[in-house]
């Protein structure tokens, strides 16, 4: 599988991210997933707008303009052997010394990969699929020492 990491397309086994990356240390980053049908990104402009809102929410400058994101995503799609796929990506604040304060000189890490989307049967398309809903209590568990410390570094 070919992935994208900081300006390079490379085999997934060659992709390396620093252990000091704030995404790893603090969960200091955002993600987005763009569905792709017949090699065409679905509602790309809306997904990139949501990415921008997420980046703004954690006060992280967007490392790319819309046209750059689109070009990277389209090239990643072209590297994959499947037509329907989900392009998943993360943008982190990058590698820096371990400190809750935002680093002034860190370069964001941009990682993207793509996986095939599941094929739905006609019955699933016409009749739907079962789902389960649950309350989202992730941020209510401040008593747990999880590695996502995003709440600590953004507020």
Listing of model-derived features with the role each one plays in the protein:
Residues 1-155:
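Conserved alpha/beta cores of soluble small-molecule-handling proteins
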């Amino acid at each position: 599988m070919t992935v994208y990491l900081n300006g390079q397309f490379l085999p997934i086994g060659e992709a390396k991210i620093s252990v000091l990356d704030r995404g790893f240390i603090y969960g200091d980053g955002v993600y987005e997933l763009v569905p792709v049908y017949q090699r065409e990104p679905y509602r790309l402009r809306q997904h990139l707008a949501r990415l921008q809102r997420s980046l703004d929410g954690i006060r992280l400058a967007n490392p790319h303009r819309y046209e750059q994101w689109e070009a990277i995503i389209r090239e990643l799609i072209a590297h994959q052997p499947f037509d329907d796929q989900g392009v998943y990506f993360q943008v982190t604040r990058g590698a820096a010394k371990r400190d809750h304060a935002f680093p002034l000189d860190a370069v964001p890490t941009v990682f993207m990969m793509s996986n095939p989307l599941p094929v739905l049967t006609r019955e699933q398309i016409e009749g739907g699929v079962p789902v389960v809903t649950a309350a989202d209590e992730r941020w209510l568990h401040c008593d747990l020492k999880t590695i996502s410390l995003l709440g600590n570094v953004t507020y």
